[in-house]
Amino acid sequence: MNKHTNKKKLGALMVLAYASCAAQISANIAKDCAAPLAGGYTGRGVLIAIEDIKTITQDGSNPRIITAIELKAGRKLSVIDNVFSPSPLTGSTTQSNTDDGMMKFRKSMVLQVPVRGADASKDIVEPSFQAPLGYLAILEKKDRSGDGSFEAIGFEQGLTANADGITRNEYENGGCTMLTMSCNETVFEYSFFDTDYDTTKTAFDALLAESY
């Protein structure tokens, strides 16, 4: 999958050829007039338990691009549908940090859970912090440019609910439970993308069909 690491054999040992992590900006910081940026999420997405994923395929030239996701046989994923919200996933952020002494990006996803009761507690809220490996989220954005239209969060370190990330106030957000899930990753943005927007949208819709 990831072809950017070179290896060479030395006797009985396998050693990695040196590759510097240093980099410099290599693209213009300018608006794309042909495809202007459109901010915001549609409110649709999927949440996949990492342990239920069979394979994740990455682009050979840029491993930040996830081209395909295959679930293990018989496994399902959870559809995120916050389309009813006037500003879905508000509060979702990506912010750089050096909490463990290395530059990483703290990513947070804020969902509204529009159901309640014992089943919602058992099947949605409590498992948000109980999954051993966490979750991978694919979130649909309003931007339809292609690369970047479907954000992937939790590829390196699975998303889990924050320690204080589960709240409910009956007089706010329509009584929905607010669920904040976070992870730390070394890459600013992973994108679910294959070929063009239409191809990727078809793949995203196929994931929706694998829901509970």
Map each language-model feature to its residues:
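Mixed-charge, glycine-accented linear interaction segment located at domain edges/termini
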Residues: 156-212
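Structured, beta-strand-rich domain cores
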Residues: 86-154
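Generic structural motif
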Residues: 50-53, 114-118, 142-144, 158, ...
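Solvent-exposed edge beta-strands and adjacent loop segments
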Residues: 9-12, 18-108, 157-171
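Intrinsically disordered, low-complexity terminal tails
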Residues: 1-2
